[in-house]
Design a protein with these regions (language model features):
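C-terminal motif of bacterial Sec signal peptides marking the signal peptidase cleavage site
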Residues: 12-15
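Structural signature for solvent-exposed beta-strand/loop edge elements and short helix-capping sites
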Residues: 17-139
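Terminal module of membrane-associated proteins
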Residues: 6-7
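Bacterial N-terminal signal peptides that target proteins for export
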Residues: 1-3
Length: 139
């Protein structure tokens, strides 16, 4: 038991050398936020404006151009401005990035936009407008 204590103490003393290395932090790639299965509901004037869902959100707020990255895709549902629950359009993509300073979104990979067409003030959907793309920008 005494021998084990001496060996342990010797190991501890010799393992604490002066090989301290400094690590340089690259703020452009330093993740400051990570969230899984995030859902955000945006309200304007008491009315639901949109619901945003992402399986993974990673934020880089210390970068020169701060951004949020959605590497596992996004799903966005917008609502008509005159209703609490009437869906207006949906956007889905495999990947997205949001540049905070420019307030600019970029979606990539199997981007699908589906817009529900209605006559003004009506709740009946008269048709759908579908757009398929590999990339979409909006602000």
């Amino acid at each position: 038991m005494v021998a084990l204590s001496i060996v342990g103490s010797a190991t501890l003393l010799f393992s604490c050398g002066k090989d301290t290395k400094r690590t340089v932090v690259d703020y452009e790639t330093l993740m400051t936020e990570s969230s899984e299965n995030r859902t955000i509901t945006m309200m304007e004037n008491g009315m639901r404006s949109y619901v945003f869902t992402a399986p993974l959100v990673e934020g880089y707020s210390l970068a020169k151009n701060p951004y949020q990255e959605f590497r596992r895709g996004i799903h966005l549902t917008t609502f008509t401005s005159d209703s609490l629950s009437l869906e207006d359009a949906t956007i889905k993509a495999n990947y997205a990035i949001y540049y905070e300073n420019q307030k600019l979104w970029e979606a990539k990979g199997n981007v699908v936009i589906i817009k529900k067409n209605r006559k003004e003030g009506d709740t009946v959907v008269t048709g759908l407008t579908e757009v398929y793309s590999q990339q979409l920008f909006w602000n």
